C-alpha cells in the first residue's frame, strides 16, 4: 500500500507512521521521512474490494516529532485491481481482481430538481448510490460532471465502480461513431489545450485515492476531442492503476484499454476490437412522465417515450435481453 503525506512544515527529525487496520487488528505498518512515500506491505491474505464485498481498511497516518504526535489523519484504503485479459475464447474482457467482470450501470449526470448540479443533502447523495446498488447495478458512469468527495466515498463504501468522465468542452471534429475515425483531429488553441490538461490532471489527482474509480474517460462523443491517442497514453501514464476509455462513443482510435460504442435506443454492437475490450457505453434513453413527480411537465426527455410503468419495464427487459 503506497501512502504519500504532504507535510511541507515538518521538522527535520519528524517521521510519518502509517498503520493499516482491519477492525481492531493491525495488518500492516510503515515508517517514512516527511516527503518520502511510505510503503506498507499488505498480508498475502489481504481482503479485496469489489461490488460484492466492498471491504475498506482503516488507515491512520501520524506525523511524529520525536515521541510527540504533531498531527494525525484517519482515513481508509482498499486493495483491488482493474485490468483487461483474454478469456478462454480469446476475447478481451474487463477484469476486477484478475476475474472477468461484466460492468453494468447507469449514465449518471448528477442532476437535482431543485439544485441542478448541487444535491440538497449528503443523505441525498448517498441515497442515489444505495438505490443504484439495490437495482442490481455494479457501476456508474459519472457523465461529464465531477461530484463532491462525499459522493465517491459513498461509492467506495457501498461497492459501486465509477467510470469518471472529463467534463466535455464545446467544439470538436466531425463525429464518426460507427467507424474508426478517418478525418482530421480537432486543433485546440494552445490555451485551451493547456486548460484541458491542467483540469484533467487535477480531476485524476483529486480522485486518485478513491478505490471506486475504475475507468478514466477523457472524451465523450467527439466533444472537444483532440490528440486522442496522446491524451489516452498521457492519462494511462499519469495513473496506470485504472483503465482508460479514450473516447466514449467515438471518435474511435486504436488506443486505450477499450472501444466504447453508443447506440440509441436499442443496444447494438457495430464494431469490434480484437486487441481491446469492446463495450456498449450508452443505449436506452427510455422516458416516461410520472404524474406527481414532474418538475417541468412540458420538458420531459427521452429517446423513446412510454405512458405506463409496464411499457417501460417491457422495453427495459427487451433492451437488456
Predicted feature descriptions by range:
Residues 1-154, 158-162, 199, 214-215, ...:
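Secreted/periplasmic carbohydrate-active enzymes, especially glycoside hydrolases
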Residues 129-131, 139-321:
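Substrate-binding/catalytic cleft of secreted carbohydrate-active enzymes
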Amino acid at each position: 500500500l503506497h501512502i504519500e503525506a504532504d507535510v511541507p512544515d515538518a521538522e527535520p527529525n519528524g517521521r510519518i507512521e502509517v498503520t493499516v487496520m482491519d477492525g481492531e487488528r493491525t495488518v500492516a505498518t510503515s515508517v517514512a521521512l516527511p516527503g518520502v512515500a511510505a510503503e506498507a506491505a499488505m498480508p498475502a491474505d489481504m481482503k479485496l474490494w469489489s461490488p460484492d464485498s466492498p471491504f475498506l481498511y482503516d488507515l491512520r497516518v501520524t506525523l511524529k516529532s520525536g515521541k510527540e504526535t504533531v498531527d494525525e489523519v484517519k482515513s481508509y484504503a482498499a486493495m483491488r485491481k482493474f485490468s483487461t485479459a483474454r478469456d478462454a475464447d480469446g476475447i478481451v474482457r474487463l477484469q476486477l481482481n484478475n476475474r472477468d467482470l461484466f460492468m453494468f450501470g447507469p449514465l449518471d449526470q448528477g442532476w437535482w430538481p431543485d439544485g441542478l448540479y448541487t444535491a440538497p443533502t449528503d443523505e441525498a447523495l448517498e441515497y442515489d448510490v444505495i438505490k443504484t446498488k439495490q437495482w442490481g447495478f455494479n457501476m456508474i458512469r459519472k457523465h461529464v460532471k465531477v461530484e463532491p468527495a462525499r459522493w465517491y466515498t459513498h461509492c467506495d463504501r457501498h461497492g459501486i465502480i465509477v467510470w469518471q468522465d472529463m467534463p466535455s468542452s464545446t467544439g470538436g471534429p466531425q463525429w464518426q461513431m460507427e467507424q474508426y475515425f478517418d478525418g482530421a483531429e480537432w486543433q485546440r488553441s494552445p490555451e485551451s489545450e493547456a486548460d484541458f490538461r491542467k483540469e484533467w490532471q487535477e480531476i485524476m489527482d483529486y480522485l486518485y485515492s478513491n478505490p471506486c474509480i475504475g475507468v478514466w474517460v477523457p472524451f465523450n462523443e467527439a466533444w472537444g476531442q483532440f490528440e486522442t491517442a496522446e491524451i489516452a497514453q498521457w492519462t494511462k501514464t499519469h495513473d496506470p492503476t485504472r483503465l482508460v476509455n479514450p473516447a466514449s462513443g467515438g471518435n474511435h482510435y486504436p488506443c486505450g484499454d477499450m472501444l466504447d460504442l453508443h447506440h440509441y435506443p436499442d443496444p447494438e454492437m457495430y464494431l469490434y476490437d480484437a486487441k481491446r475490450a469492446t463495450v456498449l457505453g450508452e443505449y436506452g434513453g427510455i422516458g416516461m412522465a410520472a404524474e406527481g413527480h414532474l418538475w417541468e411537465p412540458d420538458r420531459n426527455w427521452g429517446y423513446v417515450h412510454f405512458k405506463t410503468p409496464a411499457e417501460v419495464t417491457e422495453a427495459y427487459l427487451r433492451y437488456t435481453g
